[in-house]
Amino acid sequence: LRFLCALPNMETHADLIAGLPLYHLHEIFEDVRTLAGYAAGEIQLESLKLLPGTEMRRRAEELGIKYSPLPPYEVLQTHEISVSELQTARQLSRLLDGFYNTPAWQTLTRELILNDEQFLHRFLAYLTKVNLIDQPMSLEKRGLILYEFCKQNYPEYQIQAAIAWIEAGMSLKKL
């Protein structure tokens, strides 16, 4: 994957799957950091689905996987990841989609991920605290949130956040 991400003529999209047997929440966060370090073009994080007729579904009990009997048959819990941890993974997926996977905010988000291993935890806690993690947000709203978060928690990135804002075509009057 490192090789593919390093190719200059293509963008690599990497997928992580929460709810796989033996996969812990802390490993998901580590894998996001690793993929950010590879400069993956997008990092997708989804929950495992146990579709009828699949080997994984047949072995669910043996593997310690509890899943919804209704479509989309998402994993609800495993021996390694609790219900609340899967909820955290879902919220991390929203964070990645809204910030890392958005070209305007990707460079800054990647740098924050790589330079502070607690960034994802802190930013996720902030987005949850201000009730925004599950809200649809415009590009501008996400930029304002990232700028304010940097201003409060990472002042050394405030200028970079302002530059990303300008490069995204936003007015400085709104910062």
Predicted regions and their residues:
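A structural motif corresponding to the C-terminal lobe/cap of the Radical SAM core domain
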Residues: 1-117
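Radical SAM enzyme core and accessory elements
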Residues: 91-175
